Structures are given as C-alpha cells and as structure tokens.
Amino acid sequence: MNAKEANFDGLVGPTHNYAGLSFGNVASLSNEKSDANPKAAAKQGLRKMKQLADLGFAQGVLPPQERPSLRLLRELGFSGKDADVIAKAARQAPELLAAASSASAMWTANAATVSPSADTGDARVHFTPANLCSKLHRAIEHESTRRTLAAIFADEARFAVHDALPGTPALGDEGAANHTRFCAEYGAPGVEFFVYGRAEYRRGPEPTRFPARQTFEASRAVAHRHGLREEATIYAQQRPDVIDAGVFHNDVIAVGNRDTLFCHEHAFVDPQAVYDALAASLGALGAQLNVIEVPDRAVSVADAVGSYLFNSQLLAREDGTQMLVVPQECRENANVAAYLDALVAGNGPIRDVRVFDLRESMKNGGGPACLRLRVVLNDAERAAVKPNVWIGDALFASLDAWIDKHYRDRLSPVDLADPALLDESRTALDELTQILGLGSLYDFQR
C-alpha cells in the first residue's frame, strides 16, 4: 500500500528557557541561566516546518505541553492558589520550578517510539510514549504526550496509543531519538533498529561520566509491545565513550532513513557487526543497506556534538535521492562544512543539504532531528489523522500570528517566578487547541 513518512514537529512552548537541566547534554549545560527568546524559538521551528511542507514533505505539528506544571509542583508539596504555588517554589526550590517550567516537550523525537502498520502484529500504527525517567523535567511529559497522540491519532481501528513503560531506571526509554527504521519503500515491511546505552540485566560496557538514558530492556519491551517480527528487529549498543563525550541520544551520532544509515564511525559498539545485522535483515526484505560512515579524521566526535551534524533530518525525495536537513552550526564548523560539500559532490544517496537557523533550540541541545517525530502513514491512515495539524499556508499564518500575540521575546530563569507567565501560557494554549481542533487537551481546560 502507498505510504509516506510524515514528520510531526513540536511547537516550542511559551516558557522556553535555559535552565541547564540536562546533565549529559553539553549545550544545555553550557548555556545555563542565559536569556532565551521564546518567540524566536517558536518561529524558527515553525519556519522549518513550513519550508519542508513547501518542498512536498508531509509535515504536521504537535502542540506544547502546559507549563509550568502546577500538577508537579502540587505533588511536590507546594500548596495554595496557583500564584502561591509558583511563589513558594521559586523561593524554596527554584530548581523544581525550573523543571516544572521546561519547554522540553518541543523535542518530539523523545515523545514516543512509532512503528508503522506494515511492521506491527495487528497492522495498526503503534505509539509508545517515552517515560523519559532519567530527568525530572522530562519524566512529567509522557501522560500529556499520550493524551495528545490519542487526540490526533484517534481512530483505534488504525492507531494504538499505549501508556509509557513503567518509569524505572531498568526501563529507561527516550523514544524515537534512539530508534530508526529501514525499508525499501515506506509502505513495505521494514527493519526496526533500536539503540541503547546500557543493559540493566546484562554485563557490558557503560559510560562513566554521563548517564546512559536508554536501556536494552526498554527497547526490547517496546518492540514486543508493538508486535514486531523478531527477525526484522535489530538492537545495537551505542559506544559508552561517545555518551561521555556528550552524545546523550543516538540521534546525535547517527540518522537513518529508507535504505540509508548515516553515522559516525564511533557511533556503535562493534559497528561492523551492526552493519552486517542490518544488511542481512534488510536484504531478506529485498533491499540493500547503504552505510555512509563518517571517519573520525574528517569529523571528530567533538565536531559532531558541537555542530549536530547527525542530529539532522534525512528525507527521501521523489527522485529516490535523499536530502539532509542540518542546523546552521554545521556551516560554521569548517570540518563539518567541508565534509558536507564533499558528501553532496559525491555519487551517494545524499544529494542535497538544506541549512536552517534553529539557534534557540540548539542552545538547549536540540537540532532538526530532535524537533520531529517520524510517523509512516498510508493513505487511509493519513486521512484518519486530525486534519488541522497539517502544516500549510493557512495553518502557518495562524500559528505565526498566534506566536506574535502570545509569546515573550525574552525569558530568563528568574522570570519563571512571574505568575503572569502561567496565565499567558494558558491563554495561548487555550487558543491553540481551537486552532488545531484538538478539544480540551490540557488539565486547566477540564
């Protein structure tokens, strides 16, 4: 059946700020306590969505979550009226207010793991929201993520939206940032590729400086839950030393699409065995794997982390070639820029590179790939998606005006104590649910 890959980007929320909450994320820590521009952040992401939609790619949008999370703050013992809760948290535990105010749900690569209907046991598209249990500010996302996905992909005959895995370190799950899918055609059965940082119950190498957020056990549980065929499911371990170098998700060191894997030579433990396993599984489906392995002598791991070369989108064009969507930091790094020029000049599958300004997201450690959740849909499934979430001229104009109306152009960590920010955010989100036709999505609307 005819199918295409759709990208659902997270719309940056009104509380976008730099609180330095993500240990292991070099950009997040290095920009801690600097001023953010929520309006610019949201517009940068929206313009990427619109330009890709204009190029003919299926592009959807996912709304921000309600922040600050009064639910979290109340669960942590802060009481009183909403303004009192925020004031007490700001005075007694500003780090908890920062966690409750994070706009990190914008990085929808961590929202869920998605398996298309061609791969699953019941021929439905399966979504498992990521529990993100390694970080407090992200561990509060999964219930709202489930609610949002269930509203957009509401047809239970075609879509299965699961709860997150139990939030224990043994089942630490970071979603699609550690998952990709290889296939000959999107509508044909494919090979699903899960990358983990450590195993809870198997002895093996682990990072020593930064935590490994994804476990083998979580990846395997998602595969079982989605009913994936064992012979078409491959697991690989990310190299611990690159996690310690700031590669906190696999999508900072590798990206794949269709029959192509684009990765750094130090991405995986025993990389040749990984390539061989993928090639064998894909070969059994009648497709040939293309591996573009970037040598460390051309682009170091430090260059990859600094530029986010691999946190790019690899998109299939109608002529069968692929296009790489990268942040502008790739052009500002001489080694990476030279590599990209040589890559496009070659005769490989990647023939075009598009550069985007995503500076506000990048300063928190999120590039083009972080901002999108890939969902392969056939024609009938796409028709069943809530229609108002697809980016086109009208929705772009509505969202652009909505951002202008509701977003601040400067936000520092101390501004999170402003009770007006909660009111501004709720007013904005209430209007957004009407624009997107999603009903009463948020706690404050219920």
Swiss-Prot record:
GO molecular function: N-succinylarginine dihydrolase activity
UniProt keyword Aminoacyl-tRNA synthetase present: no
Annotated substrate binding sites: 19-28, 110, 137-138, 213, 251, 364
Keyword Hydrolase belongs to the record: yes
Enzyme Commission number(s) of this protein: 3.5.3.23
Catalytic activity: N(2)-succinyl-L-arginine + 2 H2O + 2 H(+) = N(2)-succinyl-L-ornithine + 2 NH4(+) + CO2
Pathway(s) this gene product operates in, as recorded in its UniProt entry: Amino-acid degradation; L-arginine degradation via AST pathway; L-glutamate and succinate from L-arginine: step 2/5
Keyword list, A-Z: Arginine metabolism, Hydrolase
Residues annotated as catalytic: 174, 249, 370
Cross-referenced SUPFAM superfamilies: Pentein
Signal peptide (UniProt feature, chain positions): none
InterPro entries: AstB_sf (IPR037031), SuccinylArg_d-Hdrlase_AstB (IPR007079)
GO biological process: arginine catabolic process to glutamate; arginine catabolic process to succinate
Broad enzyme group: hydrolase
Function summary: Catalyzes the hydrolysis of N(2)-succinylarginine into N(2)-succinylornithine, ammonia and CO(2).
Subunit (UniProt): Homodimer.
HAMAP family in UniProt: AstB (MF_01172)
Family designation: Belongs to the succinylarginine dihydrolase family.
PANTHER family found in the cross-reference section: N-SUCCINYLARGININE DIHYDROLASE (PTHR30420:SF2)
Name of this protein: N-succinylarginine dihydrolase
Organism classification: Bacteria, Pseudomonadati, Pseudomonadota, Betaproteobacteria, Burkholderiales
Gene this chain is encoded by: astB
